[in-house]
Design a protein with these regions (language model features):
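Alpha-helical structural segments
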Residues: 26, 30-37, 41, 55, ...
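C-terminal peripheral helix-coil segments that are non-catalytic and often amphipathic
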Residues: 1-18, 104, 111, 115, ...
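Short hydrophobic/aromatic patch on the recognition helix
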Residues: 56-67
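Membrane-interface starts of transmembrane alpha-helices
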Residues: 163, 167-171
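Residues at secondary-structure transition points
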Residues: 18-22, 26, 68, 72, ...
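Basic, helix-initiating cap at the start of DNA-binding domains
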Residues: 1-42, 47-55, 72-75
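Amphipathic alpha-helical segments used for helix-helix packing
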Residues: 101, 113-135, 183-186
């Protein structure tokens, strides 16, 4: 009788279904998506690696296998956001005057950063908490913007609008000049209308300097 029951039990056994093994890239994307979700909900400083791991039903060790630290996680999120920015920025081409292109780019940067701060306050907190860290995403973002500015300057020189110069070096200088209207920390509590006016004034000043550089 016992033997018969055992056979019946074995007959009704079903193989345990295991979740399909995810690739390293899929796991990495899951971690980034969950981290951003938790940062958005609770704030950057309130979320630990252990919280992200628990939300994904995985061990903290698995998070660290993909990201060496919380800052490394932030760096990866930063690169993802820069990728979105590069797809959305749509700078004006050389058929437009250099001044118009500078103004368009500066306003786009200012408005995008201001909008991000209002829609995603965790971004501001994240920037403050990692300000003193060596973040590769920040360096890359700077490179992207400088390149866009340098292209405008080069086209302006080619058209005879701007004086000949080292466009890449000057692009970096122009970025520094625009910092007060595009850096998230500096514009977080500013009225967008006041920022727009200041941005226009700065762009006009930059344009004048590019047309009439100081004699060395």
């Amino acid at each position: 009788m016992i033997e018969h029951a055992s056979k019946a039990d074995r007959k009704n056994d079903r193989p345990v279904k295991r979740r399909p093994r995810r690739s390293a890239e899929e796991t990495r994307r899951d971690i980034l998506a969950k981290a951003e979700e938790l940062f958005r909900e609770r704030g950057f400083n309130a979320v630990a690696i252990a919280d992200i791991a628990a939300a994904l039903s995985m061990s903290p060790a698995n998070i660290f296998k993909n990201f060496s630290s919380k800052n490394a996680l932030v760096d990866a999120l930063g690169f993802e956001q820069i990728g979105v920015f590069e797809r959305q920025i749509c700078p004006l081409d050389k058929s437009h005057p250099p001044l118009e292109r500078l103004r368009h780019l500066a306003h786009n940067l200012m408005e995008q950063h201001h909008q991000d701060l209002n829609k995603n306050p965790y971004v501001f907190e994240m920037i403050l908490m990692t300000a003193k860290q060596d973040m590769k995403c920040g360096d890359y973002y700077k490179t992207v913007i400088v390149k866009l500015l340098a292209e405008i300057i080069e086209d302006g020189v080619e058209a005879g609008t701007y004086a000949a110069t080292d466009a890449l070096s000057l692009g970096e200088t122009v970025l520094h000049a625009l910092t007060s209207v595009i850096h998230p920390v500096l514009i977080a509590r500013e009225d967008i209308g006041n920022l727009a006016t200041r941005c226009d004034q700065l762009v006009d000043l930059i344009d004048a300097g590019l047309r009439n550089p100081l004699a060395k």
